[in-house]
Amino acid sequence: MKTGSLTPYDIVNTIIRNRGGMASSERKVLDATWNALENYVTSDNTLVVVDGSGSMYGGSSVKPVAVAESLGIYFAERNKGAFRNHFITFSTNPQLVEIKGRDIFEKALYCMSYNECSNTNIEKTFDLILNTAVKNRLKQSDMPSRLIIISDMEFDIA
Protein backbone atom coordinates (compact mmCIF):
# COMPACT_ATOMS: atom_id res chain seq x y z
CA MET A 1 0.00 0.00 0.00
CA LYS A 2 1.40 3.40 -0.95
CA THR A 3 1.14 5.74 2.00
CA GLY A 4 3.57 8.41 0.85
CA SER A 5 0.84 11.04 0.65
CA LEU A 6 -0.69 10.13 4.01
CA THR A 7 0.49 11.42 7.35
CA PRO A 8 -0.02 9.85 10.77
CA TYR A 9 -2.55 12.54 11.63
CA ASP A 10 -4.70 11.70 8.59
CA ILE A 11 -5.26 8.26 10.07
CA VAL A 12 -5.81 9.36 13.67
CA ASN A 13 -8.09 12.21 12.55
CA THR A 14 -10.33 9.59 10.90
CA ILE A 15 -10.40 7.68 14.20
CA ILE A 16 -11.29 10.82 16.19
CA ARG A 17 -14.15 11.58 13.83
CA ASN A 18 -15.43 7.98 14.12
CA ARG A 19 -14.55 7.17 17.73
CA GLY A 20 -18.14 6.23 18.48
CA GLY A 21 -17.65 3.14 16.37
CA MET A 22 -16.11 1.86 13.21
CA ALA A 23 -16.68 -1.32 11.22
CA SER A 24 -14.08 -4.05 11.66
CA SER A 25 -13.15 -3.84 7.98
CA GLU A 26 -12.54 -0.08 8.25
CA ARG A 27 -10.37 -0.61 11.33
CA LYS A 28 -8.31 -3.23 9.48
CA VAL A 29 -7.74 -0.83 6.58
CA LEU A 30 -6.69 1.97 8.95
CA ASP A 31 -4.35 -0.37 10.81
CA ALA A 32 -2.78 -1.66 7.59
CA THR A 33 -2.36 1.93 6.41
CA TRP A 34 -0.79 2.91 9.75
CA ASN A 35 1.63 -0.02 9.62
CA ALA A 36 2.62 0.89 6.05
CA LEU A 37 3.57 4.49 6.91
CA GLU A 38 7.11 5.38 5.95
CA ASN A 39 9.66 5.46 8.74
CA TYR A 40 11.27 8.89 8.88
CA VAL A 41 12.79 8.26 12.30
CA THR A 42 16.51 7.89 12.92
CA SER A 43 17.82 5.45 15.48
CA ASP A 44 17.57 8.10 18.22
CA ASN A 45 14.67 8.07 20.67
CA THR A 46 12.16 10.91 20.34
CA LEU A 47 9.72 11.41 23.19
CA VAL A 48 6.50 13.34 22.55
CA VAL A 49 4.56 15.39 25.10
CA VAL A 50 0.93 15.19 24.00
CA ASP A 51 -1.67 17.87 24.77
CA GLY A 52 -5.12 16.33 24.66
CA SER A 53 -7.09 19.20 26.21
CA GLY A 54 -10.48 20.27 24.88
CA SER A 55 -9.08 23.16 22.86
CA MET A 56 -7.06 20.67 20.80
CA TYR A 57 -10.36 19.28 19.42
CA GLY A 58 -11.23 22.55 17.65
CA GLY A 59 -11.12 23.09 13.93
CA SER A 60 -13.15 21.81 11.05
CA SER A 61 -10.74 19.61 9.13
CA VAL A 62 -7.65 18.19 10.84
CA LYS A 63 -7.93 18.54 14.58
CA PRO A 64 -4.78 19.59 16.48
CA VAL A 65 -5.30 16.64 18.82
CA ALA A 66 -4.97 14.30 15.82
CA VAL A 67 -1.50 15.72 15.16
CA ALA A 68 -0.49 15.42 18.83
CA GLU A 69 -1.87 11.91 19.40
CA SER A 70 -0.67 10.53 16.07
CA LEU A 71 2.89 11.77 16.47
CA GLY A 72 2.91 10.58 20.08
CA ILE A 73 2.07 7.06 18.89
CA TYR A 74 4.24 7.24 15.75
CA PHE A 75 7.43 8.11 17.63
CA ALA A 76 6.61 5.88 20.63
CA GLU A 77 6.37 2.83 18.38
CA ARG A 78 9.80 3.58 16.95
CA ASN A 79 11.58 4.24 20.25
CA LYS A 80 13.79 1.65 21.86
CA GLY A 81 14.25 0.55 25.46
CA ALA A 82 12.35 2.08 28.38
CA PHE A 83 10.70 4.73 26.19
CA ARG A 84 9.35 2.31 23.56
CA ASN A 85 5.57 2.67 23.21
CA HIS A 86 5.46 5.60 25.65
CA PHE A 87 4.47 9.27 25.50
CA ILE A 88 4.20 11.98 28.16
CA THR A 89 0.98 13.79 29.01
CA PHE A 90 0.90 17.60 28.80
CA SER A 91 0.03 18.25 32.41
CA THR A 92 0.79 19.97 35.68
CA ASN A 93 1.54 16.41 36.84
CA PRO A 94 2.87 14.72 33.69
CA GLN A 95 2.71 10.95 33.29
CA LEU A 96 4.80 8.61 31.18
CA VAL A 97 2.06 6.54 29.55
CA GLU A 98 2.60 3.14 27.98
CA ILE A 99 0.44 2.87 24.87
CA LYS A 100 -1.87 -0.14 24.81
CA GLY A 101 -4.08 -1.54 22.07
CA ARG A 102 -4.17 -4.20 19.38
CA ASP A 103 -4.53 -1.81 16.45
CA ILE A 104 -4.21 1.90 15.73
CA PHE A 105 -7.89 2.45 16.54
CA GLU A 106 -7.49 1.03 20.07
CA LYS A 107 -4.15 2.78 20.57
CA ALA A 108 -5.58 6.18 19.61
CA LEU A 109 -8.61 5.75 21.86
CA TYR A 110 -6.37 4.62 24.72
CA CYS A 111 -4.14 7.67 24.32
CA MET A 112 -7.16 9.97 24.22
CA SER A 113 -8.27 8.58 27.59
CA TYR A 114 -5.33 10.50 29.12
CA ASN A 115 -6.57 13.88 27.89
CA GLU A 116 -6.92 16.62 30.47
CA CYS A 117 -7.28 20.37 30.39
CA SER A 118 -4.08 21.63 31.96
CA ASN A 119 -1.00 23.68 31.45
CA THR A 120 2.28 21.83 31.83
CA ASN A 121 5.03 21.84 34.37
CA ILE A 122 8.03 21.44 32.11
CA GLU A 123 10.38 20.94 35.06
CA LYS A 124 8.29 17.95 36.22
CA THR A 125 8.37 16.63 32.66
CA PHE A 126 12.17 16.60 32.67
CA ASP A 127 12.21 15.12 36.20
CA LEU A 128 9.94 12.33 34.95
CA ILE A 129 12.33 11.53 32.10
CA LEU A 130 15.32 11.58 34.46
CA ASN A 131 13.58 9.41 37.07
CA THR A 132 12.65 6.89 34.37
CA ALA A 133 16.28 6.80 33.24
CA VAL A 134 17.56 6.27 36.80
CA LYS A 135 14.93 3.61 37.57
CA ASN A 136 15.82 1.68 34.40
CA ARG A 137 19.58 2.35 34.70
CA LEU A 138 19.71 3.77 31.21
CA LYS A 139 22.89 4.78 29.48
CA GLN A 140 23.13 8.21 27.89
CA SER A 141 22.70 6.57 24.48
CA ASP A 142 19.32 5.13 25.58
CA MET A 143 17.94 8.53 26.54
CA PRO A 144 15.62 10.48 24.25
CA SER A 145 17.67 12.79 22.06
CA ARG A 146 14.60 14.89 21.23
CA LEU A 147 11.54 16.01 23.16
CA ILE A 148 8.67 17.24 21.00
CA ILE A 149 5.90 19.17 22.76
CA ILE A 150 2.68 19.47 20.76
CA SER A 151 0.25 21.89 22.37
CA ASP A 152 -1.78 25.05 21.99
CA MET A 153 -1.58 25.82 25.71
CA GLU A 154 0.86 27.38 28.16
CA PHE A 155 3.87 26.31 30.15
CA ASP A 156 4.43 26.90 33.85
CA ILE A 157 7.52 28.89 34.79
CA ALA A 158 10.37 26.50 35.61
Predicted regions and their residues:
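Acidic, glycine-rich A-domain
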Residues: 1-158
